[in-house]
UniProtKB/Swiss-Prot annotation:
The keyword Kinase does not apply. Pathway: Amino-acid biosynthesis; L-histidine biosynthesis; L-histidine from 5-phospho-alpha-D-ribose 1-diphosphate: step 7/9. This is Histidinol-phosphate aminotransferase. Belongs to the class-II pyridoxal-phosphate-dependent aminotransferase family. Histidinol-phosphate aminotransferase subfamily. Keywords: Amino-acid biosynthesis, Aminotransferase, Histidine biosynthesis, Pyridoxal phosphate, Transferase. CDD domains: AAT_like (cd00609). The gene is hisC. It comes from Rhodococcus opacus (strain B4). GO terms for biological process: L-histidine biosynthetic process. Coiled coil: none annotated. The keyword Transferase applies.
Length: 380
């Protein structure tokens, strides 16, 4: 069916009475292309084990017996399992009352801005960082206040605290490890941000399992009215298709989110599948060590080729410098390798994949390094 044959296709978004703050904005969209090597969305490349697949299938089969009923609207059993995982992973004695879950960490962040942002309120982030933060701010009519990082992409805590003191944001986002640069933020630095913030601080720990840095969860009891730590099962847990995000905070934050969450937002199927995935956490997270080793190997290969590699604590690598990032991205795609142009001039981001995928990426990088698309190639 052509566009001309689609009912209503004679108008575009601009013809709709859309909110003014959304006009001219672009939707989130990482390219989804079928190519031999896909290293653009920071997924765990290791597929689930047979034991996990079987457990998910059986759990969903059992849950299907109750599909005619609404699910547990508070997902108590799932939140209990998530709390137990966090205790094992971080050593912080959180309970079910400290944990909330939703359909991916983006829904968690959206609920937080619905409750603590909104018209007349502001959210601050340190860019470049996760591209969904400003999109969620726009969607909730929360003013977005971007503060630039240092030239090496690390968080400038002095500049951050000064900006917080000047702008007085209601919400502050700190991403650790930061996407797309890979830096982690230390506990001492987080304390400075928390001490300076007049409102809440959301520490986005989507990639925490890949980092050796202590989790911000250790600060929840110290900053109960300010700190929220968001996490996801999409990355290290290899559960991107399951769409499960969660947070840990003082119980009062969960009470606040109950005011804005949609009823029965987590399906019985999602809850059952996520609980099954958590039962296999040890096997799944075993791949984290393999990916960390591959991250070191790929980083060294890129550096040996002449690229500038930003140190990373996550499962991705930001590297450059390219004379034209968009053309360099296309050059990788032409070689069957899909990576990500994250909008940082001169740099691209590649997910750490399986060894064979990384080998293909390294070969493509060697070829591209010899062209006019890189600073070193241009000098040659």
């Amino acid at each position: 069916m052509t566009a001309a044959n689609v009912p209503g296709s004679s108008i575009g978004v601009d013809a709709l009475p859309i909110r003014e703050n959304l006009r001219g904005k672009s939707a989130y969209g990482a390219p989804q292309l079928t190519v031999p090597v896909q290293l653009n969305t920071n997924e765990n490349p290791h597929p689930p084990t047979k034991a996990l697949v079987d457990d998910v299938a059986e759990s969903v089969r059992e849950a299907a017996r109750e599909l005619h009923r609404y699910p547990d609207r508070d997902a108590v059993a799932l939140r209990t399992d998530l709390a137990a995982y966090l205790v094992r992973q971080t050593g912080v004695p959180v309970t079910v009352d400290n944990v909330w879950a939703a359909n991916g960490s983006n829904e968690i962040l959206q609920q937080l801005l619905q409750a603590f942002g909104g018209p007349g309120r502001s959210a601050m982030g340190f860019v470049p960082s996760y591209s969904m933060h400003p999109i969620i701010a726009d969607g909730t009519e929360t003013e977005w206040l971007p503060i630039f990082r240092r030239a090496d992409f690390a968080l400038d805590v002095d500049a951050a605290t000064a900006a917080i003191a000047e702008r007085r944001p209601d919400v502050v986002f700190v991403t650790s490890p930061n996407n797309p640069t890979g830096h982690s933020v230390g506990i001492a630095e987080l304390r400075r941000v928390l001490d300076s913030a007049p409102g809440i601080v959301i520490v986005d720990e989507a990639y925490a399992e890949f980092s050796d840095a202590p989790s911000a969860l250790t600060l929840i009891d110290e900053y109960p009215s300010k700190l929220v730590v968001s996490r996801t099962m999409s990355k290290a847990f290899a559960f991107a298709g399951g769409r499960l995000g969660y947070l840990a905070a003082a119980p009062a934050f969960i009470e606040a989110l109950l005011l804005v969450r949609l009823p029965y937002h987590l399906s019985v199927v999602t809850q059952a599948a996520a609980r099954a995935a958590l039962r296999h956490a040890n096997e799944t997270l075993g791949s984290v060590h393999a990916l960390a080793a591959e991250r070191v190997r790929v980083s060294k290969a890129l550096e040996d080729t002449g690229f500038h590699v930003i140190p990373s604590d996550a499962n991705f690598i930001l590297f450059g410098e390219f004379t034209d990032s968009a053309r360099a991205w296309q050059a990788y795609l032409d070689r069957g390798v899909l990576i990500r142009d994250v909008g940082i001039p001169g740099y691209l981001r590649a997910t750490v994949g399986l060894a064979s995928e990384n080998d293909a990426f390294i070969v493509a990088s060697d070829e591209i390094a010899a062209t006019e698309l890189t600073s070193s190639g241009d000098r040659g």
